[in-house]
């Protein structure tokens, strides 16, 4: 592994991403596939690029990412969180800008569990008057 490599772990919903950053040309590899191949949806690609665009480093860093668990939006959010943490390790002066954009905070929202006696998490069984 390279000496000048920076690491960040990101999580969102049930997804976890490991992000490795090193100086390069803006190449992004996710699970051995390119960003365009891995995320067909443009919104997911946009979410992944948000922290890099904010600090204007889209073509200065190479990213190697492994992500597992969850779906498309959860994985994209986990990658964004991981990239943010790796960028802060790379340069601590980026933290205020990333914090102001809201990328540093882990999004704690996740699926609410189903309760006994209910049909879903909050959906009550149909009420019959007679």
From Swiss-Prot:
Presence of the UniProt keyword Kinase in the record: no
Disulphide linkage map: none
InterPro entries: Ribosomal_Su5_D2-typ_SF (IPR020568), Ribosomal_uS9 (IPR000754), Ribosomal_uS9_bac/plastid (IPR023035), Ribosomal_uS9_CS (IPR020574), Ribsml_uS5_D2-typ_fold_subgr (IPR014721)
One CC-aspect GO term: cytosolic small ribosomal subunit
A single BP term in Gene Ontology: translation
Pfam families: Ribosomal_S9
Signal sequence segment: none
Protein name according to UniProt: Small ribosomal subunit protein uS9
Lineage: Bacteria, Pseudomonadati, Pseudomonadota, Gammaproteobacteria, Vibrionales
